[in-house]
């Protein structure tokens, strides 16, 4: 009995370090009030950027960081040497967008914003260099995972759009041994591509979180930033299919607490409005299923007169209002400017 017990303890002692070594990068998105966050394997700390204090909510795993769509982003540092020489890696990221990114109205096509990655991509996907990885989200809702194997680019591009207002657990397995790159969303394979055999090309040390590496702005406001929740980012050595089974601990909360803007003298203290973002032209008041509904122009990404959504607030009594998910959002090529005005009919 003692021998069995001793062997069990020894086995655990050997097994536990193997598990810890298999995790090469771990970045929880639990940001302190002073803007500090950590990469937990190296224990390096970084400061997030933003016009206001960072905002966190209960996340898929622990706390999640709420990015505002116009000013929030992070440039962290990872050690690319821990990825060097690897032929099999697993990348994992939790995302819950409120809206799709902005784009310039004088240009066609879909613009892409880096949710997280170290590939130097601009908004039109022009690439500087031939190395690195990135999870990207487009202005029409397309999403993709990009990586390099033996210096050759591989793109996994699902046909469906990335769901808003819900957790998307994005997992990419890059297998340079069996020549396959697969992207999963919430445990289901959504795209797969053949790659060349060889080592994964790790890219540089700068990790772009919530913004592409280029500086695209209108005045002081970024155009290529992400609006929504980000939670744990991890890179594992090897192909880790067990990661696909992970479930979110909490539903995503994309509204802001009223306390966030309590000191804003330009914000009405008694007025039905969204919890954040740009709003204008309230229309379409109606009573339906026991609640009052009001619709309005809303730009969840920030103070932009383009890519407008059709916002939605509801009330039981006409003085206390809560925000619902946007009713209509620009997603197709003809929706460049978004939803400008309208009305509501009940049938």
Show which residues each predicted segment covers.
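Short strand-turn-strand beta-turns centered on an Asx-Gly dipeptide
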Residues: 184-187
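Bacterial Sec-dependent N-terminal signal peptides
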Residues: 1-23
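Localized edge beta-strand/strand-to-loop motifs within extracellular or lumenal beta-rich domains
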Residues: 166-182
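Flexible glycan-contacting loops in extracellular carbohydrate-active proteins
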Residues: 60, 193-229
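Extracellular glycan-recognition modules
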Residues: 24-42, 46, 60-61, 69-146, ...
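Beta-strand-rich interaction surfaces with strong enrichment in secreted/lumenal proteins
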Residues: 78-81, 157-161, 196-197
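Carbohydrate-active catalytic/glycan-binding domains of CAZyme proteins
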Residues: 232-234, 239-347
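Short, aromatic/His-centered strand-loop micro-motif at the edge of beta-sheets
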Residues: 145-169
């Amino acid at each position: 009995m003692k021998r069995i017990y001793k062997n069990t303890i020894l086995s655990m002692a050997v097994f536990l370090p193997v598990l810890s070594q298999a995790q090469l990068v771990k970045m929880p998105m639990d940001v302190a009030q002073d803007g500090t966050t950590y990469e937990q394997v190296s224990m390096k700390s970084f400061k997030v950027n933003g016009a206001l204090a960072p905002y966190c909510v209960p996340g898929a795993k622990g706390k999640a960081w709420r990015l505002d769509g116009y000013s929030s982003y992070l440039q962290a540092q990872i050690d690319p040497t821990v990825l060097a020489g690897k032929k099999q890696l697993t990348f994992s990221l939790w995302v819950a967008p409120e809206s799709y990114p902005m784009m310039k109205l004088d240009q066609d096509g879909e613009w892409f914003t880096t949710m997280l990655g170290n590939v130097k991509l601009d908004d039109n996907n022009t690439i500087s260099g031939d190395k690195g990885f990135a999870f990207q989200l487009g202005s029409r809702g397309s999403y993709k995972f990009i990586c390099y194997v033996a210096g050759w680019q591989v793109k996994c591009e699902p046909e469906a759009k990335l769901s808003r207002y819900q957790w998307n657990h994005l997992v990419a397995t890059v297998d340079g041994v069996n020549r396959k790159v697969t992207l999963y969303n919430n445990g289901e394979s959504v795209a797969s591509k053949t790659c060349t055999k060889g080592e994964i090309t790790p890219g540089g040390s700068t990790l772009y979180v919530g913004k592409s590496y280029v500086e695209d702005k209108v005045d002081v406001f970024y155009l290529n930033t992400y609006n929504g929740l980000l939670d744990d980012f991890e890179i594992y050595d090897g192909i880790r299919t067990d990661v696909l089974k992970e479930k979110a601990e909490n539903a995503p909360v994309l509204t802001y607490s009223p306390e966030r803007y309590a000191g804003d003298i330009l914000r009405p203290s008694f007025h039905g409005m969204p919890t954040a973002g740009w709003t204008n032209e309230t229309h379409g008041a109606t009573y339906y299923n026991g609640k009052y509904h009001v619709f309005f122009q809303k730009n969840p990404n920030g103070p932009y007169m383009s890519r407008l959504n059709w916002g939605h607030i509801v009330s039981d009594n006409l003085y206390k209002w809560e925000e619902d998910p946007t009713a209509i959002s620009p997603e197709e090529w003809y929706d460049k400017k978004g939803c400008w005005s309208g009305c509501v009919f009940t049938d």
